[in-house]
């Protein structure tokens, strides 16, 4: 939980700023069974207006405010009736509430114009949320999404300091000021190194990301970027905790003549050799590999993935760095005690992106050693995005229909959850899971990881 001194500072800051803006109420989505919220009578749809007289701007404010032991809540129910509730609790007791949104005062959108932005490489006509350019430091703190730091106001920097919002996840791309400003099409992007100094002076930390665009920020520029970041990775309290290097993703919808070059096998091998050489240097000077390549580099280069130990504690797993090794490790654990056979013969299918198919064949082969079980793995391209080699999370409903229609999928199709919008059964092209199921005429089971895949395969 938040320590007492931080809470005092944070609540003080909240009270100063509470009249400067007027966020929307926090709408309750669910209440944990047996929680204080349930005891108080909260219901989905109720609106939390104020906590101790302060209107929370977001989930971070809510967490800071509710750590107080004495709370005065102002709530409006679905009928529009206002309720005032006073309660006492322990500092570490949660109210047990979740909300429909994490931000009650709106999303901070990006003010850059990066030519490689994936949001700009989508077709028009889909749900609005697909076109929102998130560059919000609060979502970075809460969920690990990346931001550029170019749209922060003085009040934002003060809040980051007072509420100790650390670590944040920062899209760096380049540390050389002119180059970063060029890449982001924003003069404020050149302030990054001063901003890292600001974090250092306050003992705040970040994780970094570099999206490689061949001919722009690779080669010598990449060397400079990683070595500049590594300077801030030293000491007992490093500012930069880790750096992920990821390849630029290009789709068939991107603007013509954008000057961007796709990553090919030759480029991938050059970048791997370059970064692995720097890793050896960082291991000696920092005690960590510090900078890691996302799994796609090795798959594109047709090279073996590094050993699991090379990724240390997987600081960038959610960014696709070491995620395949982590999955295979979990699969080894999940398949350690497989039955020699299943009573009722079973045939099912598992669909993944073509880029990762070869890396996962060993996992499917191990399941196929169970007598009576047949698991077929389908690695699909994406005609939707115009990518032959695609990661699993970018496959759309249309891609699945095109790749799987009229195929023998067996009794069940195992579908990784990363293809669907979080919390909803809808793909990136707005096709619903129900529509896909009806078209393919096969039961579909959503799987979230190795344990789910093994359970789905061997269960009756």
For the regions a language model picked out, list residue spans one by one:
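Radical SAM enzyme core and accessory elements
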Residues: 1-21, 27, 302-460
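PDZ-domain C-terminal substructure recognizer with occasional recognition of PDZ-binding tails
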Residues: 7, 63-99
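Short, structured beta-strand/loop micro-motifs enriched in basic residues and often containing a Trp
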Residues: 24-33, 53-56
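Conserved PDZ fold ligand-binding element
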Residues: 37-57
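Short acidic beta-strand-loop surface patches of small beta-rich interaction domains
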Residues: 53-60, 78-80
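Conserved Radical SAM active-site core
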Residues: 80-82, 89-238, 249-278
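Flexible glycine/acidic-rich beta-alpha junction loops that bind and position SAM and/or redox cofactors
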Residues: 216, 238-266, 286-309, 382-387
């Amino acid at each position: 939980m938040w320590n007492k001194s931080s809470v005092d500072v944070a609540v003080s800051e909240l009270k100063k700023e509470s009249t400067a803006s007027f966020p929307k109420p926090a709408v309750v989505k669910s209440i944990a069974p047996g929680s204080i919220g349930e005891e108080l009578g909260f219901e989905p749809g109720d609106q939390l207006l104020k906590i101790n007289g302060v209107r929370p701007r977001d989930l971070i404010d809510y967490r800071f405010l509710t750590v107080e032991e004495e709370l005065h809540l102002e709530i409006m129910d679905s009928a529009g009736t206002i309720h005032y509730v006073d309660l006492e609790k322990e500092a570490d007791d949660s109210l047990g509430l979740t909300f429909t949104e994490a931000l009650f005062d709106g999303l901070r959108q990006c003010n850059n114009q990066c030519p490689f932005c994936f949001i700009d490489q989508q077709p028009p006509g889909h749900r609005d949320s697909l076109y929102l350019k998130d560059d919000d430091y609060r979502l970075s703190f809460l969920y690990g999404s990346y931001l550029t730091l170019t749209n922060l106001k003085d009040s934002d920097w003060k809040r980051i300091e007072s509420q100790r919002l650390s670590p944040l996840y920062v899209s760096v791309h380049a540390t050389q000021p002119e180059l970063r400003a060029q890449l982001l099409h924003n003069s404020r992007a050149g302030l990054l190194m001063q901003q890292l100094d600001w974090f250092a002076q306050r003992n705040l930390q970040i994780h970094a990301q570099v999206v490689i665009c061949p001919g722009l920020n690779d080669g010598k520029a990449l060397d400079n970027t990683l070595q500049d970041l590594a300077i801030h990775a030293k000491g007992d309290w490093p500012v930069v905790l880790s750096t992920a290097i990821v390849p630029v993703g290009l789709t068939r919808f991107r603007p013509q003549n954008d000057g961007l070059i796709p990553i090919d096998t030759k480029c991938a091998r050059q970048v791997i050799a370059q970064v692995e050489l720097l890793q050896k240097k960082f291991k000696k000077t920092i005690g960590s590999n510090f900078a890691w390549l996302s799994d796609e580099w090795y798959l594109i280069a047709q090279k073996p993935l590094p050993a699991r130990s090379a990724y240390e504690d997987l600081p960038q797993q959610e960014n696709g760095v070491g995620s395949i090794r982590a999955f295979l490790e979990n699969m080894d654990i999940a398949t350690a005690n497989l039955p020699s056979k299943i009573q009722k013969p079973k045939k099912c299918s598992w669909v993944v992106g073509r880029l990762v198919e070869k890396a996962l064949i060993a996992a499917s082969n191990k399941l196929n050693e169970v007598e009576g079980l047949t698991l077929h793995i389908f690695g699909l391209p994406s005609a939707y995005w115009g990518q032959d080699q695609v990661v699993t999370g970018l496959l759309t409903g249309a891609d699945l229909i095109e790749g799987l229609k009229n195929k023998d999928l067996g009794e069940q199709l195992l579908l990784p959850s990363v293809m669907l919008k979080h919390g909803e059964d809808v793909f990136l092209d707005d096709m619903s899971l129900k529509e896909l199921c009806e078209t393919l005429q096969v039961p579909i089971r959503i799987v979230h990881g190795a344990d789910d895949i093994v359970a789905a395969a061997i269960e009756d």
